[in-house]
């Protein structure tokens, strides 16, 4: 598993730590508490974050939620499934060339997952970036290997937070 450092120029986007406004932090803590209550039966390990249209802040919510849950001591992986406009690697300063979800899917080797995961320094989260942007995102996300990857992540982590494209534009989120 690789390590990435947090980028201070993007900290304003992801502000659950440091000098974030109290109300902002408390809103995410409240969301975390409600999700933990819902998942107390152990059946809510994967949380998919989407929006209806672009620029509504779904990636912001996904990253802040992942960091807030991780701050409570849970093992959290954030998966960038927005294979059309992947931004998590850029925001968290993970090299774009680093292998990600699409690379693991196309390799058809579950062992490739371990090398694709990146632990983000000082955040408590692990990230699976989108990887190489494919010409056929919906078909790739529909592949049987995708289901195996998510099953592996659900076994290894307490929570799997998934950032997807807006639902009104493409069917990628519905496939997941």
Task: State where each predicted segment sits.
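P-loop NTP-binding module
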Residues: 1-176
């Amino acid at each position: 598993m690789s390590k990435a450092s947090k980028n201070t120029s993007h900290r304003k986007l992801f502000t659950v730590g440091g000098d974030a406004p109290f109300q902002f932090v408390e809103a995410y803590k409240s969301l975390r508490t409600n999700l933990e209550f819902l998942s107390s039966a152990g059946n809510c390990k994967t949380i998919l974050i989407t929006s209806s249209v672009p620029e509504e802040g779904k990636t912001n919510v996904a990253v802040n939620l992942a960091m807030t849950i991780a701050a409570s001591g849970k093992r959290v992986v954030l998966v960038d499934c927005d294979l059309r406009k992947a931004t998590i690697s850029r925001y968290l300063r993970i090299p774009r060339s680093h292998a990600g979800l699409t690379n693991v899917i196309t390799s058809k080797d579950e062992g490739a997952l371990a090398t694709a995961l990146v632990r983000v320094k000082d955040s408590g989260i692990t990230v699976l970036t989108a990887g190489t942007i494919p010409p056929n995102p919906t078909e790739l996300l529909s592949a049987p290997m995708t289901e195996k990857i998510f099953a592996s992540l659900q076994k290894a982590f307490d929570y799997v937070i998934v950032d997807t494209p807006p639902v009104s534009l493409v069917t990628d989120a519905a496939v997941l």
